[in-house]
Amino acid sequence: MKKILNKYSRRLTEDKSQGASQAMLYGTGMNDADMHKPQIGIGSVWYEGNTCNMHLNQLAQFVKDSVEKENLKGMRFNTIGVSDGISMGTDDMSYSLQSRDLIADSIETVMSAHWYDGLVSIPGCDKNMPGCMMALGRLNRPGFVIYGGTIQAGVMRGKPIDIVTAFQSYGACLSGQITEQERQETIKKACPGAGACGGMYTANTMACAIEALGMSLPFSSSTPATSVEKVQECDKAGETIKNLLELDIKPRDIMTRKAFENAMVLITVMGGSTNAVLHLLAMASSVDVDLSIDDFQEIANKTPVLADFKPSGKYVMANLHAIGGTPAVMKMLLKAGMLHGDCLTVTGKTLAENLENVADLPEDNTIIHKLDNPIKKTGHLQILKGNVAPEGSVAKITGKEGEIFEGVANVFDSEEEMVAAVETGKVKKGDVIVIRYEGPKGGPGMPEMLKPTSLIMGAGLGQDVALITDGRFSGGSHGFIVGHITPEAYEGGMIALLENGDKITIDAINNVINVDLSDQEIAQRKSKWRASKQKASRGTLKKYIKTVSSASKGCVTDLD
């Protein structure tokens, strides 16, 4: 008996009672034969106003052409996106994280309402990646991700630069390290065309995680946006989605607990973004896999950092592509027994089978260190707890800035206040900068603190101050930084009670973050604390404040 591949769409296309549905589909140009073909949603996060996304409509057309060669019907649709790089450092960065859940909601909505049989999702920027994955997990229909791809490095006076160079140029100019003319030249040359920010920032981190999970084709995460190989990846979309339909392989068959462990290992080895903690928690929630922040610490305890990527290192993702790409890294890890090779992937094969014929990394490469010569012996993403963060926090400690910091609190109730303090010289060596009321509810939307960390680095204070926040950090942030502090200030967490001059210890060896206050002093301060007014009174941010969970639960909006 022939397998039915259009088991969802036939509800509309073959049911006589759905004549109006069929009339509208005929009106789109479909013919009689099309009515019996499986319908594949091609969900692109295309928009013109961002280098990460500007080319995705073209990729979606390549995917549609490939899908239709396989006697399937490709149905392109779009969803929204937010450019973190553009909104960073402004009040409207509040819209970034909630766009992840809007992307998931909108893809789920279109796919479900139109009864599509499968999904090829094409994200390009930071929140696009987990948003598409959460939709795939919720729907649990055959599907996979084609990453829009990474940008090429910019070049200024013979040296490679990127988006973080542009962010740091302001602080460097303020401190006299570069001229205004050099700053202008930097921002004009940092982004040479289409593709996601080039270092191991959030988009590339999540692309690596998705490939390690088995939810994208091999090499997807490291293939540059404008390369021939990215077009070739799109050309494989049709045969890939048809194979998934024929084998009835669905996201929840692939996104297992072991697959998430593979993802956590790879992003640790790659030196990935702190945002991966939030996003993997949310993606796991979408497929009912039990994952917690403590699982990240378990992986960090036994997994080294090997990749010398920006922001703390030298290289960008396009450099890795040139020496074998992400699969070459995973092959090395598989040989070392660090990955589960038996995990199923969207090729229909296991991870080990996918990697079988992949070439090894060149012996003399300087991008990926050998296991016996790591950049850091344990993971850079450290989960810290203590009286400042009873429910946890996420630190990004590469080791270059040390692993213990003791200093005095310099407290700011917003990102803008802290930026003004740096500009006027009110941030000093030895400070533990505290930026609060920037959490999921308080921000709202848990804005990223890339502007503050870039100012610190640009001003030459990266080795001399620490920064803690209930907000997030961009994948481009580096230094001695601790984010995702829970409970957040808006809900009366300890970070709301900190005062200037408090002695704070951040210990990434013992995984603690404490303020030197007695329980009695903390109780006295707590009794005087009053909740602040919500920053949004209408619209999508108001809804987000009411529904979002804590950072330690992934900031999802659909928990009971």
Curated annotation (Swiss-Prot):
It holds the Pfam family ILVD_EDD_N. Its EC number is 4.2.1.9. [2Fe-2S] cluster binds at residues 52, 125, 197. Its cofactor is [2Fe-2S] cluster; Mg(2+). InterPro entries: DHAD_IlvD/Edd, Dihydro-acid_dehy_C, DihydroxyA_deHydtase, DiOHA_6PGluconate_deHydtase_CS, ILV_EDD_C, ILV_EDD_N, IlvD/EDD_N. Binds 1 [2Fe-2S] cluster per subunit. This cluster acts as a Lewis acid cofactor. Mg(2+) binds at residues 84, 126-127, 448. Keywords: 2Fe-2S, Amino-acid biosynthesis, Branched-chain amino acid biosynthesis, Iron, Iron-sulfur, Lyase, Magnesium, Metal-binding. One of its GO terms (biological process) is isoleucine biosynthetic process. Disulfide bonds: none annotated. Pathway: Amino-acid biosynthesis; L-isoleucine biosynthesis; L-isoleucine from 2-oxobutanoate: step 3/4; Amino-acid biosynthesis; L-valine biosynthesis; L-valine from pyruvate: step 3/4. It is an enzyme of class 4 (lyase). The modification N6-carboxylysine is found at residue 127. Homodimer. Functions in the biosynthesis of branched-chain amino acids. Catalyzes the dehydration of (2R,3R)-2,3-dihydroxy-3-methylpentanoate (2,3-dihydroxy-3-methylvalerate) into 2-oxo-3-methylpentanoate (2-oxo-3-methylvalerate) and of (2R)-2,3-dihydroxy-3-methylbutanoate (2,3-dihydroxyisovalerate) into 2-oxo-3-methylbutanoate (2-oxoisovalerate), the penultimate precursor to L-isoleucine and L-valine, respectively. This is Dihydroxy-acid dehydratase.
